[in-house]
Amino acid sequence: SLTRAGLMAGNIMLFGRCWGVMGNYVALYGKQQLGIVDGTGIFFALLSSGLFISRLYGVKGLREGKLAENALEGAVISTVGYTLFALAPGIWAFYASALLIGLGNGRMYPAFLNMFISVARHDQRGTANSSILTSWDVGMGLGILLGGVLSQYLGYSAAFWFTAASQATGTLLILLF
């Protein structure tokens, strides 16, 4: 039954929080803290390139049924990306982290989608699909809200460390699958 997917939903909410913070505040951070006026679009181009590339090389593990392994590998790569972003506030880390986060999320999300669907009965697959999307959306909304509060009162660094910690927590929780 889908009640077994509760831990996975919690993980997806953690990962969605990261995406909510990064996706909404990275351009402001780049402009205000790093002085990148016209280059924040490159961040998103590298992020989407990472997503695309990881979908190409991560599909083999999915076909072999290595869902948790694929999710863990992607989560670790994303954790490195978010941590690099928080740890090294510079232009090179800004762009390198985008590629790493894209590579990780592109590998992690399809694995989670397959795990959600695999715990559902045949007649619950639509519910499983909507459950992962709802979990992601709730996480993103919380990330946008919490990231805004942290950025305003404690600065961007606190928001991005919160993101790295959320990603690391979700990564460790995968070990429970």
Feature roles, as predicted:
Residues 86-97:
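Helix-loop junctions at membrane interfaces in 12-TM secondary transporters
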Residues 149-167:
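A membrane-interface helix-boundary motif in multi-pass transporters
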